[in-house]
Amino acid sequence: MDVFMKGLSMAKEGVVAAAEKTKQGVTEAAEKTKEGVLYVGSKTKEGVVQGVASVAEKTKEQASHLGGAVFSGAGNIAAATGLVKKEEFPTDLKPEEVAQEAAEEPLIEPLMEPEGESYEDSPQEEYQEYEPEAKGP
């Protein structure tokens, strides 16, 4: 009986040791996983922020170029239609600078719909939900 008890005791110690090693391994794995997830998350966030900044800068550049072209085109149209004499059109203005200023200035007046109502004040119409008609067999 003594041998049997000693064998069970040794088995118990082995199970406890294995459980302790497993617990330690799981804890280490969890920490490494957490570190990995945080690293990937921080790199993803950096990439998104950098991407958004890049897109915003490119959009600003394109708006500036487009604004310059519109400004030049408007001047040519005004001169061609006789609204403004070509000599009266300011030559010292650089379309890129005017477009840059226009892109940076906020809208002073709210956008208006053709009927004169602002988009912000549009009435909320109530709607009624209809049940679909049952189709016959």
Curated annotation (Swiss-Prot):
- Annotated InterPro entries: Synuclein, Synuclein_beta
The entry's function note states: May be involved in neuronal plasticity.
Record gene name: Sncb
Q: Which residue stretches belong to region 4 X 11 AA tandem repeats of [EGS]-K-T-K-[EQ]-[GQ]-V-X(4)?
A: 20-67
Q: What is its main location?
A: cytoplasm
The protein's UniProt keywords, in alphabetical order, are:
Cytoplasm, Phosphoprotein, Repeat
Localization terms from the record = Cytoplasm
The cross-references to Gene3D superfamilies, in alphabetical order and at most eight, read: Helix hairpin bin
| Tissue specificity comment | Expressed specifically in brain.
- Name positions with the PTM Phosphoserine: S118
Where is region (Disordered) located?
88-137
**Protein name per Swiss-Prot or TrEMBL:** Beta-synuclein
How is the polypeptide modified once translated?
Phosphorylated. Phosphorylation by G-protein coupled receptor kinases (GRK) is more efficient than phosphorylation by CK1, CK2 and CaM-kinase II.
Q: Which superkingdom is the protein from?
A: Eukaryota
**GO terms under cellular component:** axon terminus; cytoplasm; growth cone; inclusion body; neuronal cell body; presynaptic cytosol; synapse; terminal bouton
Give the family, as the similarity comment puts it: Belongs to the synuclein family.
Q: Which residue ranges have biased composition labelled Acidic residues?
A: 98-131
* One GO MF term attached to the UniProt entry: cuprous ion binding
A Gene Ontology BP annotation from the UniProt entry:
synapse organization
Annotated sequence repeats reside at 20-30, 31-41, 42-56, 57-67
Compositionally biased tracts (Basic and acidic residues)? 88-97
